[in-house]
Amino acid sequence: MAFLTHLLVCVFGMGSWVAINGLWVELPLLVTELPEAWYLPSYLTVVIQLANIGPLLVTLMHRFRPGCLSEVPVIFLILCVGTAACILLAFLWNVTSWIQGGQHSVAFIVLTFFLALVDCTSSVTFLPFMSQLPTYYLTTFFIGEGLSGLLPALVALVQGSGITTCVNVTETPGTTLNTMETPITQGNLSPSLPSPSWHQESRYLAPRFSPLLFFLLLSFLTGCCLVAFFLLQRQPWGRQGSIEDLLHSQVTLHSIRPRDTEDTSSLGAPVSSPGKGSVEASVASLRPAQLAFIYSVVAFVNALTNGVLPSVQTYSCLPYGPVAYHLSATLSSVASPLACFLPIFLPNRSLLFLGVLTVLGTGFGAYNMAMAAMSPCPVLQGHWGGEVLIVLSWVLFAACLSYVKVMLGVILRDRSRSALLWCGAAVQLGSLIGALLMFPLVNVLKLFSSADYCSLDCSV
């Protein structure tokens, strides 16, 4: 029974961000099919940030009408909306509309907004629901949340999305002949025709399965989350679960009591490890300057990971080829949840260490941004070393800053519930600032340049 409950909690947590994570890892294929092309990531970044209206409304309801809004019907509603949006996306992802003199993926962008609305709102509804369960299920929930990024990334790796080959194209007036690898000899052409011109173009290879099947898989995963939540609702929680919680974790009970000096001995001492008291004391004694540093780092890190760098990933990776872009998008999505597991085994609460790790991750992000600014001819373009460096840079960027985000959340969680509330506000503020900063740079000022990989000539 306990194993089944852990499984349900894991599947429930997996549904929190599986749809949006799935969209990001599918981008290497989508940018080749949709009219927005290289601009698509910046559009998605802004759309996802606009979807924060959902958690904002839920938070305002809890603030001004406490007790009026129950998480259970909200969770049922958003999971039903998410499943329906994924199903519609499977059939409408490539439907375009003519707007302001050009084709645009209106259906895709609108459905992405609803998926983002679901996933953003899950941040302020899933965790309050988990507070009804015994504390030891919370770790299982976060493992499931990590799988929401890992599973779509693995599926995208199998799919092989966005892979291309270069073909030779010969052109004469009124005639265009294509060959895949060997050029057409001039002896096959009529002597009366002018000399042909040659160049290379990209031809995208068909993935192992289509976006239709990929989005149907996302629909299945979201539907599994809905079923898991329904079954969790039918579990006999209540008083028995509360008693279990108290028996399994007296430290949790101690941590929510007032942190008076006389409180730090009796209840927590028998059950906590020798270092636990010092950890709680250090968390409780955080100075305002330290808290300001933590919130600033939270906002800065999320601005980079959720707003700034995703907007230019195509420009930093595609000049090295579609394989580099495909691996960067998928492996960074794998690295992020794996890095989220590290604090379970290798926790480090030192603000100095987390600051150094933030600088290191920012360095990798700066390299990615520099390559995007130099597009379509970045450093080592056309050399295998450049491909390896850009993939490693994106993976390490995601891993370093994901670890920082988790550890700062752990520090604030141990301080108070209101600290976590302000942490969430810093996350959304940083993400919003990053998205609003990059959208005009990419789509209005057009500071980043795109080009066909096969026709690039960066020798000059």
UniProtKB/Swiss-Prot annotation:
UniProt organism field: Mus musculus (Mouse)
Entry keyword Signal: no
Subcellular location: Cell membrane
MF (Gene Ontology): riboflavin transmembrane transporter activity
Tissue: Within the small intestine, it is particularly expressed in the jujenum and the ileum. Almost negligible expression in the stomach, duodenum, and large intestine.
UniProt entry keywords in alphabetical sequence: Cell membrane, Disulfide bond, Glycoprotein, Membrane, Phosphoprotein, Transmembrane, Transmembrane helix, Transport
Membrane topology: Multi-pass membrane protein
Cytoplasmic-side positions: 1-6, 59-71, 127-137, 233-291, 348-350, 409-418
Taxonomic path: Eukaryota, Metazoa, Chordata, Craniata, Vertebrata
Gene Ontology BP terms: cellular response to heat; flavin adenine dinucleotide biosynthetic process; riboflavin metabolic process; riboflavin transport; sensory perception of sound
Main subcellular location: membrane
Function per UniProt: Plasma membrane transporter mediating the uptake by cells of the water soluble vitamin B2/riboflavin that plays a key role in biochemical oxidation-reduction reactions of the carbohydrate, lipid, and amino acid metabolism.
Family listed: Belongs to the riboflavin transporter family.
Protein name: Solute carrier family 52, riboflavin transporter, member 3
Disulfide bonds: 377-454
Gene designation per UniProt: Slc52a3
GO annotation, cellular component aspect: plasma membrane
Membrane-traversing stretches: 7-27, 38-58, 72-92, 106-126, 138-158, 212-232, 292-312, 327-347, 351-371, 388-408, 419-439
